[in-house]
Swiss-Prot record:
Oligomeric and partner information: Interacts with the Sec translocase complex via SecD. Specifically interacts with transmembrane segments of nascent integral membrane proteins during membrane integration.
One GO biological process term: protein transport
UniProt source species: Salmonella choleraesuis (strain SC-B67)
Topology of the protein relative to the lipid bilayer: Multi-pass membrane protein
Gene Ontology molecular functions: membrane insertase activity
Name of the gene: yidC
Name of this chain's protein: Membrane protein insertase YidC
Subcellular location: Cell inner membrane
Listed GO CC annotations: plasma membrane
Chain ranges passing through the membrane: 6-26, 350-370, 424-444, 458-478, 499-519
């Protein structure tokens, strides 16, 4: 085993990872949008059972804060559109990113209200409530820290239901407060609900391109309970009518995509039912229904829930609800990616540039892993020193493979050499590299984040492919500076083309990730020379043995 064979191992692991990414994405193809309404069988407690009908035609009111631009339908009080002014749709664009949308091509809404036996959103009680509002447009004025949008509905019996959206400056968490005033002679039984519904198939204008071979981020539903901190639920699964039905005190339900999320967080001490449902016409939903509340005659009861609608900013999400920050898609290595991101963010607080922060964290990570790297190179050097003895043994034993294997193991034992010693450090390092990959791909902070010169977006590919080419050049230098005992012509050809193959792979990778690999390769070159000098003093390395 030597450095160049090590590159081959890295390549095989890398290609295996890419194949796994593609398989993970394609093993459950998305269902085609249905042209006719389906009759679905849903789990107990699903949207169909709980009475969450579709929105009707009401008046559209607009709400603008410093970070949100929402459109709310007074028929039901659903949030039908959500724009995020602080996040442009594309780099250099003045058009804000649209998270929630209601168009003939695509549906993504945040629904809420009061269902239950006497709730106005229960279909058994008629159409959804048509709320009254005092004006059509609400704006958070300069110097104002809170904006309230009250919507009131009075039923035929004279009972008053008020739904108030509460916005705060700089906040993507919207509190939804409910007030139920019972003017009758019998108790009212009501339950709050919150539901997110979305079209399964993305239209062209919503496709971010995150489905290419270089990147696979999760788009779907998720939920959290005290027993299950974070569980994903694929849209495909919901579309196949394999629905969620769990009861929980606390927790949340959400819909996720790269960089952005929506979530309903019930705020009560009772038990909530979390559910999913296939609503037909290619639309799926995830939601919650709270435990019923009895409002006695002449009394007024208050209930509340919270809607998160915005970017996946981890510290802010964690402050809104436990484990809501886990919605950032760091994959199965999240337990490594999260502390790495916290370190990256801490570095950024000093240097103020995410690109330079990536460079610094690369030096830190590679410095921490230096003992493993040194052990890897030492093991490979010992293996090279044994090559003449191994070759002589093979010539002496001829085709007797069994004796070759026995004597080779005896030689390794006598020389105190582990033949897999060069692989183990690499295998240990790979999860860290993959965790960095997920961290750089899933963090909203790197979206449209500039570095220097021509790199204006670390989350996008290099428009001129300069960074991938530089990465390939650094791989070439590592290869040329590494001693080798490879004599097989096929392996030599593979080694020769390895930098080219990696360069092609990285052409479509985000600039931040390519920058990490360039710096990591430069650190490898430096560490390689330091290690070789130490090995020379021990007689385990000779510069004359290097082959160009």
């Amino acid at each position: 085993m030597d450095s160049q064979r090590n590159l081959l191992v890295i390549a095989l692991l890398f290609v295996s990872f890419m194949i796994w990414q593609a398989w993970e994405q394609d093993k459950n193809p998305q269902p085609q949008t249905q042209q006719t309404t389906q009759t679905t069988t849903t789990a107990a407690g699903s949207a169909a059972d709980q009475g969450v009908p579709a929105s009707g035609q009401g008046k559209m009111i607009t709400v603008k804060t410093d970070v949100l631009d929402l459109t709310i339908n007074t028929h039901g009080g659903d949030v039908e559109q959500a724009l995020l002014p602080a996040y442009p749709k594309e780099l250099g664009s003045n058009e804000p990113f649209q998270l929630l949308e209601t168009t003939p091509q695509f549906i993504y809404q945040a629904q809420s209200g009061l269902t239950g036996r006497d709730g106005p959103d229960n279909p058994a009680n008629g159409p959804r409530p048509l709320y009254n509002v005092e004006k059509d447009a609400f704006v958070l004025a300069d110097g104002q820290n809170e904006l309230q949008v009250p919507m009131t509905y009075t039923d035929a019996a004279g009972n008053t239901f008020t739904q108030t959206f509460v916005f705060k400056r700089g906040d993507y968490a919207v509190n939804v407060n409910y007030s139920v005033q019972n003017t009758g002679e019998k108790p009212l039984e009501v339950s709050t609900f919150g539901q997110l519904k979305q079209s399964v198939n993305l239209p062209p204008h919503r496709d971010t391109g995150s489905s290419n071979f270089a990147l696979h981020t999760f788009r779907g539903a998720a939920y959290s309970t005290p027993d299950e901190k974070y569980e994903k639920y694929k849209f495909d699964t919901i579309a196949d009518n394999e629905n969620l039905n769990v009861s929980s005190k606390g927790g949340w339900v959400a819909m996720l995509q790269q960089y952005f999320a929506t979530a309903w967080i019930p705020r009560n001490d009772g038990t909530n039912n979390f559910y999913t449902a296939n609503l037909g016409n290619g639309i799926v939903a995830i939601g919650y229904k709270a435990q019923p509340v009895l409002v006695q005659p002449g009394q007024t009861s208050a209930m509340t829930s919270t809607l998160w609608v915005g970017p996946e900013i981890q510290d802010k999400m964690a402050a809104v609800a436990p484990h809501l920050d886990l919605t950032v898609d760091y994959g199965w290595l999240w337990f490594i990616s999260q502390p790495l991101f916290k370190l990256l963010k801490w570095i950024h607080s000093f240097v103020g540039n995410w690109g330079f922060s990536i460079i610094i964290i690369t030096f830190i990570v590679r410095g921490i892993m230096y003992p493993l790297t040194k052990a890897q190179y030492t093991s490979m050097a010992k293996m090279r020193m044994l090559q003449p003895k191994i070759q002589a043994m093979r010539e002496r034993l001829g085709d007797d493979k069994q004796r070759q294997s026995q004597e080779m193991m005896a030689l390794y034992k006598a020389e105190k050499v582990n033949p897999l010693g060069g692989c183990f450090p690499l295998i240990i390092q790979m999860p860290i590299f993959l965790a960095l990959y997920y961290m750089l791909m899933g963090s909203i902070e790197l979206r449209h984040a500039p570095f220097a010169l021509w790199i204006h977006d670390l989350s996008a590919q290099d428009p001129y492919y300069i960074l991938p080419i530089l990465m390939g050049v650094t791989m070439f230098f590592i290869q040329k500076m590494s001693p080798t005992t490879v004599t097989d012509p096929m392996q030599q050809k593979i080694m020769t083309f390895m930098p080219v193959i990696f360069t092609v792979f990285f052409l479509w990778f985000p600039s931040g990730l390519v920058l990490y690999y360039i710096v990591s390769n430069l650190v490898t070159i430096i560490q390689q020379q330091l290690i070789y000098r130490g090995l020379e003093k021990r007689g385990l390395h000779s510069r004359e043995k290097k082959k160009s």
